[in-house]
Amino acid sequence: EITLIGEDSSVAGLEVGQKLTAKQLLYAMLLPSGNDAAYTIAVASARKFKENDKLPAKEAIEVFAELMNDAATELGAEHSHFTNPDGFHDKNHYTTALDMVKIASYAKSIPLISEICGTYQITQKLKSGEEFYWVNSNKLLNQGEDCYSEYADGMKTGFTDEAGSCVISSFTKNGKTMLTVAMNSPELYGKYYDTLILAKLGFKQNKIDCSY
């Protein structure tokens, strides 16, 4: 399934034959934006859903896309449609900022996902023996960056030529969590500075002091 990823995809460096736990696959997908991990998770999930370990990878991706769309509908993401697990451009693959917030809000409520998305870096030894070091692509979590925020604790970056540079972020202070979405930024860092402005406005409206 990792051979199905698009050209120039961001990857976690996985290879055929390696063995990972489900949690390691999530780290590989969510920290370095590993599309190889995303496809592996998608195929495994679809095969389990269909109770068919021999389901061809391409068919499994179609099944997983259906599952994604069903889940999105249940979450109220009515203006989204997904065709693949990694967000690669497709005319039938689309979403909105509001729908992304709805999906991210649910993801944030899952402790494991929240923990992983808020992790800046991690070293993992696979079940097959290989060792990997993954760094989160979200620069809001990097203390060495000007856009770093001590309140940032997620969630996910994204990029395609068509969608531009995007990020959905979470900030937590005084027990309150704020989700923001920045899309189609023409510059890599532009989305982060826009995000910081949005977070400040959000916390201000909720009367929570938040200075960076």
Predicted segments with their positions:
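Penicillin-recognizing serine hydrolase domain
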Residues: V16, A46-Y212
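Active-site SXXK
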Residues: E1-T3, M100
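Conserved catalytic neighborhood of penicillin-recognizing serine enzymes
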Residues: I5-A42, E131-C147, A152
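Short, flexible coil/linker elements and helix-boundary hinge sites characteristic
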Residues: E1, L30, N206-K207
